[in-house]
Amino acid sequence: MLHTWIRTLGALLLLASVAHAQFQFFEHMFGGGRQEHQQQAAQNEPSDSSRYQNMWESAQCDKYLCPGTLACVHFPHHCPCAHPDNEDKIELSEGSAVCISKGGFQPGEAARKIELARKGVL
């Protein structure tokens, strides 16, 4: 009887230690709980626009300062796209242009879709 009780107790201790090790593994794997989430949140930039306003005010430009990229150009439609690898610049009319997502389209496809929309076909 004592032998059975000792075996049962040993099995329970083994099971408890395996379960504890398993939970420690998952806790470590997923960032260690709340402390990691607090650390990650501290890395985010605030949603305050003062940083952008400071950059705008300190920019040196005697022509036109593009609001999206802070590039200094002669005319507003000369402003570059903020993400040229992912956007195509399309001139809509004299003096106006937009940057539109390429969205995985073939080269020139975004401009064609804008033209179709302008004609009322799309």
UniProtKB/Swiss-Prot annotation:
The keyword Signal applies. It comes from the Eukaryota. Residues 1-21 form the signal peptide. Keywords: Signal. GO terms for biological process: ERAD pathway. Transmembrane segments: none annotated. Probable component of the endoplasmic reticulum-associated degradation (ERAD) pathway. Belongs to the LCL2 family. This is Long chronological lifespan protein 2.
